[in-house]
């Protein structure tokens, strides 16, 4: 199973999962794709999730009122209590109806009517404010993708270890329990790969990996993607992450590395032979394997089978394609695009 965690623009698939799936399936490896990013946003705008949020707001408010009986609340908690009380008064059924209509607008021809599209986006934003109150002080957004858990820092390892267990602020933990773990229970994968391509995905990706390992310790969880590649040297110095948060890391490009990892886990090769892999052995020793760069002219086209096309917030099917990797120039001081690749610029032939 391959998982793409939040958050990314929910208008089209990110190319990582289809690119990996194409090579895995080419090698006879059954692969399930889960774009949890778009599934999360679709889930946010459902009556089931919004009623769940309502119950969480009520629970937080009750807890503050009970505390107030025995002690004086701090100014911050008193302000939170008032905010939660105010949001108890909103007409939730009205907003549930609005976002259901908004989803139809965003996914159909009415999207091209500017006033209707703006109305739909505002309907989403109103509901996101309600969700953010539930997870306060987190700020959860639909678009632009700028959500922030605020009390946790994504570049601090201690925070990454703590955040999966925060049931008050971490919305991604609830999404993992409601969407990810249920899918794993249904599909029963032997290996789960989580592609973390952007910094804003780090909290969600680490949360998913941790809770998957906790619920299914026998599943091999591997993480990869551009951000993981950038942090490879730091994670290699943190052996306590391996086995608890995830089992291995795949750096740089992962198409064939993931195939070789699956083969190694099934006894067909040694883990030491899997290029781009970082892992910890049974004795607790860390291993950073050699690197491998894909020949893009030999890669199959991306395989989108299994992507939830009906859930993307777009009136048309937007199919991404990548004809090149790396950068032919690579000297711009303001750009770090090349950090996700080993070195050279590569391009497919025009007929491909």
Task: Locate predicted features.
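Structured core elements
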Residues: 1-2, 278, 288, 320-322, ...
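Aromatic- and Gly/Pro-rich amphipathic surface segment
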Residues: 58-85
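Radical SAM [4Fe-4S] cluster-binding motif and immediate context
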Residues: 297-352
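Extended, charge-enriched "interface" segments that sit outside catalytic cores
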Residues: 76-99, 104, 114-120
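A substrate-binding/cap region within the structured catalytic cores of diverse enzymes
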Residues: 108
